[in-house]
Amino acid sequence: MSNDGFINLRSISIWLLLLAFSVLIGCGGGGGGSSPAAPPVVVNPSPPEPTGPDFSDVDASFQAFIDGTSDFDGISYVLVDAEGVIHQKTFGDHTEDTVVLLASTSKVPAVMTLMALQEDPEVTFSIGEPVGTYLPYDGPYADRTVEQMISNTSGIPGLRLLAEYGSPAGPSIEDFNHLCQYSGQPIFEFESCGQTLVQNELPTSRPAGRAYDYGGSQWQIAGVTASVAANATWNQLVDRYLGTPCGLEVFTFGNPWESPTSFTGSVESLAGTTNPNIEGGAITNMADYAKLLQVHLNGGFCEDTQVLSEASIASMQVDRGGVVATNAKPYGMGWWIQTSNPGVLTDPGAFGAVSFIDVNRGIGGYMAIDEYGDQADSGAPRAFFIDQAIPAIQSAWDAAGN
């Protein structure tokens, strides 16, 4: 029952008691004299409790989106502020427990893991040092820093050069070259694949800090460097710095790229957990990603544990991709900076998932999609969420007087 409903019932019950009391007085015996009239009783009900934002129009837009497409059987989203979940809704065949492949919406949690490792006083690791500081081998990319890699400014060719990363047809393992980072086959090992990436220079490589070039090998090298520095697997680091303190249920990294449609929604069906793909291999449910977004809104906390400093959170939002000379794009570390919607940062994925925070309003959200076939227009849900849903969410938030 709503607070308003409780207040109204309470007011009604008070008036009924007063009415019953007046009837008892009227029915009482007595002599011929009359008593002075009692002063009127004035009841002032408490003002109604403030109501939260009304996201019904946002819900309706999600329903309209899913009704208007044959590509997707379900969609869901969750909104948070610094205190917790403020709204969530599922549509179609989605439930609150639906687990999806995140693709590039893995990037923000990956950066969170790296920043938390940097803050760990028991591990020698800095995103500002060349990766060769920590790796037991040299190579053309050993002089690049993790900070440059996770801001897509390392000079290592990104996904634009994917066709020249290697040959998935072999005939030898070496022919895979940089494509080893996208394989869940047990013949590929996480750290040895990282060594392949560092030591095999790609065409059109540039000096660090000159150009923005999204995704690819630079992200994998960053994750491998962290694992070597900490003497731990990547998923051990994710569990140590995010999973355990935040109480995450399913969040983990694998490597589904060779056959994403083989993922059934269960953790057990996720391929490649021993060779996880850093930039795009994570899975999550709504509750887990909601907790990760809260960290960016409450000063770095999961419950009573601070998993990231405010300085690290702020550093992730600083534009690094938009200040280079070539192909400049407003990008922090993991976050795309939405210059057309000030204060909004997003992390969209190839399968259609998107996360966002609005630092001006202190809110954030995550949208889940679970259609991984080639026939699905994964750009449609991303465009819908960023261009339509987020502005509608902001309007509902503002209308509530926040």
Which residue ranges define each predicted feature?
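Catalytic-site signature segments of enzymes, centered on catalytic residues
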Residues: 160-260, 276-290
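Secretory-pathway/luminal and periplasmic proteins that interact with or process carbohydrate-rich
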Residues: 86-87, 138-147, 155-162, 232-235, ...
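Active-site-proximal loop and beta-strand segments within enzyme catalytic domains
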Residues: 73, 94-214
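Catalytic loop of the DD-peptidase/beta-lactamase superfamily, centered on the K-T-G motif
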Residues: 31-89, 98, 230-232, 244, ...
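Structural recognition of the beta-strand scaffold that forms the well-ordered cores
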Residues: 76-79, 101-103, 109, 148-151, ...
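C-terminal motif of bacterial Sec signal peptides marking the signal peptidase cleavage site
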Residues: 23-26
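Short, well-structured active-site flanking segments
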Residues: 116-137, 229-256, 304-310
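Bacterial N-terminal signal peptides that target proteins for export
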Residues: 2-16
